[in-house]
């Protein structure tokens, strides 16, 4: 998206772009201009269930690939992101509001690195094996992917936070059902378009937009998801952890980080660093400084 021209968006389920089953949409507005920039599908539980079923069907083929085969697919996604760098950065500014030059391009560049890092790390998964207790026996380690991973992501870093969860899960052979924050669904669709353009197999990544109370809750509770990964607020994280009880759960919630200034600090540099720590991304970051402790 290179202008404020509004468009009707779609969800990605089983390799196909489609509206919500109900046909419902909601307007999303640019915080930079106040203009409507898209009509976002309002998925519900049935859409999430359809996506989970697609991810389960895709799991066997994806997980049976070697790490090197999956890495090649992951690098292909990185290639598409690099080609679409300008478009992705502009979309981020329109949808989320980050300044184009100082923050949006940086986030897109980080996005590429997340994909490439996960691709390479998956080739090198290591670990120690104990010696066999018998000369006639050999100890082997067989790694198996967990299954379908539900991914729920926030609005403040709408490219890098999804990549932080999506890329490692995919590189290790899992398939994914992803629902983004409703306020930055345009960015989510743009990232999903990159994955589709890179020819990830149908059903390996599924994007379902809509209210978290329905879509996110279904992803967390549905027995078809074997793990749930969440980044977001503490109250929502607690609800996700409760809904996903009994599954593997990875949760990153809001922090309460102080900025500590020691008595031997360079005050000018400390002030500059404190402003950056507290107000990067308008202060909407889990690592943002919330208190100032001066020695």
Give, region by region, the residue ranges found by the protein language model.
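Periplasmic-binding protein-like
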Residues: 167, 226-231
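Terminal low-complexity tails and localization/encapsulation signals of metabolic enzymes
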Residues: 1-40, 72, 76, 127-152, ...
